[in-house]
Amino acid sequence: MVLTRREMLAMLAAAPAAPVALAAQASQLPLNTSGLEHVGFTVPDPQKSAAFYGRIFDPQIFQEMKPPLRYYCRLGIGYVAFGPNATATPRIDHFCATVEGYRLDEMRAELATRSIRLTGSPDFNALTDPDGIRMQFMTTPGGLLPTIIASTRVTQDDAICEAVGLDHVIVQVPDLEKSAAFYRTFFGKETARERGPERIWFTAARTRLGLEQVATGQMPHIDRFGIRVAAFNRREVIRKLEGAGVTLLPATGEKLLRFRDVDGFTVEVRGI
């Protein structure tokens, strides 16, 4: 087969681009994420904390098969996880994003070229941002691991709200622009900025990650999170939450509720 001059030039022009195209295809950054899936807590009494959420979102709570016992409450396609520390101040210790076609070893190597250290195994791997906030990755569809079993049903009543999944996670940091630069690596360009208070939003599928300025004298931390729920009667849900002893917080709009959980964290519930 004899190639024309035009065909030869076309082949030569395409050849150097092939490795570049393959490298671009292999990159996992920004993440092809299906969203923020769960948040994890360190609390004095994990069973009590899980039971609190269970009464509101899913009465059947779960636990690890073996000690140290972590407890879980499902939130539709997401969940909240509670690990024990009897003497530590309660804190939200990590949040997790699920990733389509996640390849751990390749991600670890790719992040190493950016001086970001990803540690752990396929079951639990995570990195920390410049302020020590921990972010975990799991392969889509995520969910509870095989080591987790049904624990107990905390009430015979129906759930007060029908959870769909996480809605957002709010991280408070000392330098918004520095943190935004870090999270662009994983979620791409921010999708919104707000004033009063200043807030930067990143979109992760149907969920969002928000950055806020941490208060003077406080350490950087995961401050609060939101849960998407099926459409609800606000007045009826408020009545049931108050009947369950839940402390409600001010909120505006018929589709938004805010409350304080048993460990003092603010939870925001948004109807869809």
What are these language model-derived features?
Residues T4, P67, E100-R103, N125, ...:
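Alpha-helix initiation/capping motif
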Residues L22-A50, I92-A97, G142-A180, I222-V229:
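N-terminal beta-strand motif that seeds the catalytic metal site of vicinal oxygen chelate
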Residues M1, R6, A18-V20, L31-E37, ...:
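Residue-level marker of intrinsically disordered, low-complexity segments enriched
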Residues V2-L29, R108-G165, V171, R193, ...:
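Vicinal oxygen chelate
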Residues P59-D93, G101, R134-G142, G188-D223, ...:
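Conserved short beta-strand elements that form part of the metal-binding/catalytic scaffold
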Residues R103-M107, N233-V237:
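Short, conserved charged micro-motifs
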Residues V2, L31-N32, F41-V80, A126, ...:
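Core segments of cupin and vicinal oxygen chelate
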Residues Q25-S27, N32, P68, A81, ...:
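Residue-level detector of functional hotspots within protein domains
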